[in-house]
Swiss-Prot record:
Its EC number is 6.3.2.2. One of its GO terms (biological process) is glutathione biosynthetic process. PANTHER family: GLUTAMATE--CYSTEINE LIGASE. It catalyses: L-cysteine + L-glutamate + ATP = gamma-L-glutamyl-L-cysteine + ADP + phosphate + H(+). Belongs to the glutamate--cysteine ligase type 1 family. Type 1 subfamily. This is Glutamate--cysteine ligase. It comes from Citrobacter koseri (strain ATCC BAA-895 / CDC 4225-83 / SGSC4696). Keywords: ATP-binding, Glutathione biosynthesis, Ligase, Nucleotide-binding. GO terms for molecular function: ATP binding; glutamate-cysteine ligase activity; metal ion binding. HAMAP family: Glu_cys_ligase (MF_00578). GO terms for cellular component: cytosol. InterPro entries: Gln_synth/guanido_kin_cat_dom, Glu_cys_ligase, Glut_cys_ligase.
Amino acid sequence: MIPDVSQALTWLERHPQALKGIQRGLERETLRVNADGTLATTGHPDALGSALTHKWVTTDFAEALLEFITPVDGDIQHMLTLMRDLHRYTARNLGDERMWPLSMPCYIAEGQDIELAQYGTSNIGRLKTLYREGLKNRYGALMQTISGVHYNFSLPMAFWQAKCGVVDGEDAKEKISAGYFRLIRNYYRFGWVIPYLFGASPAICSSFLQGKPTTLPFEKTDCGMYYLPYATSLRLSDLGYTNKSQSNLGITFNDLHEYVAGLKRAIKTPSTEYAEIGLEKDGKRLQINSNVLQIENELYAPIRPKRVTRSGETPSDALLRGGIEYIEVRSLDINPFSPIGVDEQQVRFLDLFMVWCVLADAPEMSSDELLCTRTNWNRVILEGRKPGLTLGIGCETAQFPLPKVGKDLFRDLKRVAQTLDSIHGGEDYQKVCDELVACFDNPELTFSARILRSMIDTGIGGTGKALGEAYRNLLREEPLEILREEDFIAEREASTRRQLEVEAADTEPFDAWLEKHA
């Protein structure tokens, strides 16, 4: 089932320097909660400045949903330590609140009024909040409070020069984009390995079902928790953060222009379902527009091709201008065993897997085949640890045992690990392979199995509160290592100033501005 990558791996072993200079970044979302686990109703902490313009800490859907962002970094330890500094400083400035350590929220009642993230009075700030109003009205606020980790990854120019013979300009744009699309297609085919190893949401609180009937064979504990005994990541299931209305958009990952055309089509295609919501009620705007996607970011995807946007540029315009610059992996649950929601083992694994995905052959995929890849993901998400589970290739009928496929993949990853270790010295990457491959013979070692044992004992709420309290105490006590207190104070003031400048620069009323930008 695994493509034959031996030639590409041999090439890599001859050109190890091609992997020198991998760049990465992390984003981690987390809900601010009270000591009893309920959602904090306070505004964004003053110590963190402006959520609109702060370079390290912002908010996602809700005012209480923090998002930590590391700068682009070539050093794994430095990136993780900086992420930890962001958590340390925040923990010291949350009063009695703490950061929820799980992807799935718990103490949020159906229909509870969740305050949307606020970004001030500028047109762009109001647009961001209106977009979130649209998300709430389309999908419900509860789904939007699910948290995850995003891992951003780019290969050095030396890789593309050695592999594809790229030179500067248009040639580089096309060849590098084609290489990243190959990575993305392989991710759709084999990325289920991420929830298998690191999925950490095998259970949900009853409020998540919102009284709707479900065909999933949930088991229920006395405290009202629903779980599937072999599930890995319900966050990635239809109960979690997905968007069924997008599955027939026909967006593919074969070609830059084709992909962008599909994306642009989706933001212009009217939706009868969303038209029923309306654009306004009692003088209050309900969504940016009633199209299938309000803006491009609404496209749900487990992985995204990205380029840093310039002022006023949409994500797809940036891609057309310069091609794909980096990849955003979006399938990581919060790691409940780490105070910062992600750890070094995961980052090293993702490095290895991304390199494998860019090396392995990846035939072009129609939108139908893209949908077929969802079958494997769903199996792993809902019953990944089930004995005897099999997976298929695309839309074909042949089936293969998951543990065998996983171990075959890791045989390749071990060779990538040896190459990366040869550049950096030590055996860190190989050690990660040895630790993780054991999960295929013993699923009890996976994140989902480990956290489910705790959840069955004390419930999602009990588990989340205990971990949240422990991490709060730990982070508050740890000294900062890279950033200093004065760096945070300076950024608080600078971000507040930048927000005021954005607000002062607006010349049009919001409604008129929105007509042009929506």
